[in-house]
Amino acid sequence: MAMPPPLFAAASHASLLLPSPTIHSSTGSRRPFRLPLRSSRRPPVAAAAASGVPDEWGDRSPSAPEPPSQPDPPIDDDEWGRDDPSASGNSRPVLVTDEWGEPGVPEPQSTSAADPPTNDDEWGGDPAPPPPPPPVPEEDNEEERREELKRCLVDTVYGSDLGFRASSEVRGEVLELVTQLEATNPTPEPVQATHLLAGNWILIYTAYSELLPILAVGAAPLFKVDEISQEIDTNSMTIVNASTISSPFASFSFSATASFDVQSPSRIEVQFKEGSFQPPKISSSVDLPAEVDIFGQKISLGPVQQVLNPLQQAFASIAGSISGQPPLKLPIPGNNRARSWLLTTYLDKDLRISRGDGGLFILVKEGSPLLDQL
């Protein structure tokens, strides 16, 4: 018995293997049902929209209407939908779209802060300090230093009795100040500066041994060295050294006259010619101090004053007869002892420092304000 052919052998498509449905016509005859072939042409969009879109179950439902397309933005709108802020009369709010596609109003932006002023730095620190004042000229600074040194020197020698009672500490301080002044000498050629060198100079301190006898007399009781001076005449090339010693009874003055020759811009050679003794000036009245200091002991002079009171008339007559006498002049022999040299190491309008024969002389010009400190 022959086997029937397999079901799938003659069928070219699986759909052909299914039994063919039949459609009963009104005449009672049956005719085969054929599936309509799918058209290769797509239906119009309107027809597809009218027929609906099949869902996953094959049912068709009307599709949601698509929103109308928005027209292109005008040329004055940017890509974010914001109006041109420069357009006049634009009062509607500016809308923006966030990341979820929802419209919103942008947050107001704070205005940027103004640039800091020019005197503040970028870290907000203190303003830069003003520029320093212009430097003081070096000449002014040196002049102020000299004036201060001169005042210190006069204060140091005050009360030393021209150096006779100066202690070792005072002498050392004086030498230090003198050295500093000599280093800042404003007159490098003092002998040539005749307008400064000429005049009467008052001695305020000395370390010259030959003046010690005179200073010792001034340190004795009832005696005082009033003044030791040196007058320089650059026209006649002469020097006059004068000293005055006073007491309650009389005052005594003597001097020595010398000529000088210029040896260098700062050194002169002195040749003494004669000595002169002025007549003593007798006091018309004797005024003794209440007490004197002799070797550390105070001695009262009251009894001596009582003895001298009856003699006041006699002193007055003696003073009148002597005051008219000429000075006594004595020549000084021209030997080596009458010669000396004088080196001026500092000179200005007020102060002169000289060295000679191993001695130191500090002199202030007559009329200088420095004398008011003594």
UniProtKB/Swiss-Prot annotation:
Q: Any signal peptide, and if so, which residues?
A: none
Q: Which Pfam families match?
A: PAP_fibrillin
| GO CC annotations, alphabetized | chloroplast
Disordered, as annotated region: 19-148
In which residue ranges is the amino acid composition biased (Pro residues)?
64-73, 127-136
| Keywords attached to this entry | Chloroplast, Plastid, Transit peptide
Official protein name in the record: Probable plastid-lipid-associated protein 3, chloroplastic
Native organism: Oryza sativa subsp. japonica
Provide the gene name from the record. Answer: PAP3
